[in-house]
């Protein structure tokens, strides 16, 4: 698809969490640069370190990215994000919690919640809360920013570094 074709399409505002626990700092920075090729990066959260969940392994680094893109959610996920994960060396196994070079999760698209576990997982809630603090939990109405504060304490998530959009 040419740049002109992309300009003529409706733009979508998508929040994506970039996660990695294999060569995590390098892969996080590279992935954010690669996301910039899929649209315009509007904002990038701080990078947070969270313990690996569900299996032994190095801690994860997680960063939320707010992206404006002409790609619809299915094209973005299945043609671009999955390919990017593979290009970064991710191997999918039966173990959903296995260490990985890159994990790209779509959290919201056009203000619609995609990741239903956002409010339960520190690795998602904490970085996303920096970009979308007013997002509310559909069942309780609790603000994501409030939930993230609790999850930071519960999981010992810690801020590692910040990446500027476009760097």
Please report, for each region that a protein language model flagged, where it lies by residue.
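Extreme N-terminal starter segment of soluble prokaryotic enzymes
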Residues: 11-15
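Short beta-strand-to-loop capping motifs
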Residues: 18-20, 65-71, 108-110
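A short, compositionally biased domain-edge/stem linker segment
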Residues: 1-5
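Short, surface-exposed acidic-centric catalytic microdomains
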Residues: 29-73
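Short N-terminal binding/cap micro-motifs at the start of the first secondary-structure element
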Residues: 23-26
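Flexible, gly/pro- and Lys/Arg-enriched active-site loops
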Residues: 53-61, 75-78, 82-167
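Residue-level signal for inorganic ion chemistry
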Residues: 21, 44, 65, 105, ...
